[in-house]
């Protein structure tokens, strides 16, 4: 291990790919500074009731994930034992970067081990806490299908061209107040057309050990088309009942079978030329709740980038969210961001990037009334009683490995 540490340090200093003695290093990081039009710290725009926000020029934290994996054993027959761990760091804008307390944290979101054996047909056995088969939309950081957690399973066993997976987990995330056993079944690589394949996921949540708990389930189906306009396209349908309303995660354990949610997503990402790329999202989610708590979320947004040179891009993003509720009418939020950007390459997904940005947003009274006190949309937030506001700032974003 001492030799490995020396090699790792040398490669970091030399800017070389970080793999040595079976060790791999990957990660993600973003950080910067932002201010609001009134002179205070940047305050970010998210519609109450919407599970995500369009994030270009609309992120209010320093955040990093640092992941390392070490091959503990590699046999000539393909047997491989691997240990994987990740540290995440979070700190809100406007506060000292201590990564502790009310405005920051340091966590260990992943620590797990996997064993790959020839008999598993390309699959592996695993146990621990990990990110598991996560699906997300990049432009609003929406993890619409995320059965991650602490548990064990069999991943990607190949059978007749398909991949079969099973996972048992007890906890989705650190914020989950109550625990319940969750079983996730996944079938992938169901080829439908050249470059296109289906993936099915069924989640079953057992009745939790809390008062008035219920069991529930969810079903997710995704069609992914590769090489679509130089990128890819995703079409997703999800449905959940009871605690399955988490739609890929665990929802409220007290939700009964009359509580339901469904969601539809369409999201193409393109790179039409080496200079012009982008991503679009159209989403619809319906939540049926007891006691007049039904709501419907509509979302549409697009981010586009055009590279004027090898290292300079102009990036723009427009997003609109609407939440219709029975209790307090329809909430609306629209935002626009323009961001001159320096990058290592002209592609839409090329990173690192350094961006200057200007973001403008508008919302209605219903959104203001529903907003948490002190948040951007509230009457006690950075923009007072106004129904619009703007931010400026600079941000760096990068990812590597993985």
In which residue ranges do the predicted regions lie?
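Surface-exposed coil loops of outer-membrane beta-barrel proteins
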Residues: 32-56, 95-109, 119-211, 373-385
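Transmembrane beta-strands of outer-membrane beta-barrel proteins
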Residues: 23-29, 74, 79-87, 123-127, ...
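Beta-barrel outer-membrane channel/assembly domains of diderm bacteria
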Residues: 16-121, 269, 303-312, 316, ...
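Transmembrane beta-barrel architecture of outer-membrane proteins
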Residues: 59-65, 107-110, 147-151, 180-184, ...
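Detector for outer-membrane/organellar transmembrane beta-barrel domains
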Residues: 192-207, 212-326, 331-336, 342, ...
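Residues on the lipid-exposed face of transmembrane beta-strands in outer-membrane beta-barrel proteins
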Residues: 64-70, 110-115, 152-156, 185-190, ...
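Transmembrane beta-strands of outer-membrane beta-barrel pores
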Residues: 31-37, 72, 87-93, 129-133, ...
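Gram-negative bacterial Sec-dependent N-terminal signal peptides
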Residues: 1-21
């Amino acid at each position: 291990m001492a030799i490995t540490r020396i090699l790792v340090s040398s490669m970091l200093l030399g800017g070389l790919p970080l793999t040595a003695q079976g060790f791999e290093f990957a990660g993600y990081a973003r950080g910067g500074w932002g201010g609001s039009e009134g002179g205070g710290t940047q305050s970010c725009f998210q519609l109450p009731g919407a599970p995500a926000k369009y994030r270009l020029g609309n992120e209010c934290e320093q955040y990093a994930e640092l992941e390392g994996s070490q091959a503990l054993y590699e046999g000539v027959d393909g047997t491989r034992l691997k240990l994987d761990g990740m540290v995440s760091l979070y700190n809100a804008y406007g506060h000292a970067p201590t990564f502790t307390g009310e405005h920051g944290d340091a966590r260990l979101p992943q620590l797990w081990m996997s064993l790959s054996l020839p008999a598993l047909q390309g699959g592996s056995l695993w146990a621990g806490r990990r990110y598991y088969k996560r699906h997300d939309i990049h432009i609003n950081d929406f993890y619409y299908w995320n059965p991650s957690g602490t548990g064990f399973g069999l991943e990607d066993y190949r059978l007749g061209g398909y991949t079969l997976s099973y996972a048992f987990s007890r906890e989705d995330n650190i914020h989950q107040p109550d625990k319940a056993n969750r079983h996730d079944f996944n079938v992938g690589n169901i080829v439908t057309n050249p470059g296109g394949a289906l993936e099915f996921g069924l989640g079953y949540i057992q009745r939790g050990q809390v008062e008035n708990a219920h069991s529930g389930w969810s079903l997710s189906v995704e069609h992914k088309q590769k090489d679509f306009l130089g990128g890819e396209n995703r079409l997703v349908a999800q449905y959940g009942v009871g605690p399955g309303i988490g739609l890929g995660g665990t929802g409220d354990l007290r939700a009964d079978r009359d509580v339901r949610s469904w969601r539809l997503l369409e999201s193409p990402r393109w790179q039409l030329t080496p200079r012009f790329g982008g991503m679009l999202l159209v989403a619809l989610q319906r939540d049926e709740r007891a006691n007049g708590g039904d709501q419907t979320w509509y979302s549409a947004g697009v981010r586009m980038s055009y590279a004027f040179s090898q290292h300079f891009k102009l990036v723009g993003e427009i997003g609109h969210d609407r939440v219709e509720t029975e209790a307090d009418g329809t909430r609306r939020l629209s935002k626009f961001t323009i961001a001159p950007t320096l990058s290592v390459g002209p592609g839409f997904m090329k990173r690192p990037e350094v961006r200057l940005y200007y973001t403008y947003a508008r919302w209605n009274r219903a959104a203001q009334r529903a907003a948490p006190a002190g948040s951007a949309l509230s009457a006690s937030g950075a923009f007072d009683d106004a129904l619009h506001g703007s931010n400026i700032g600079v941000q760096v974003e990068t990812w590597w490995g993985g």
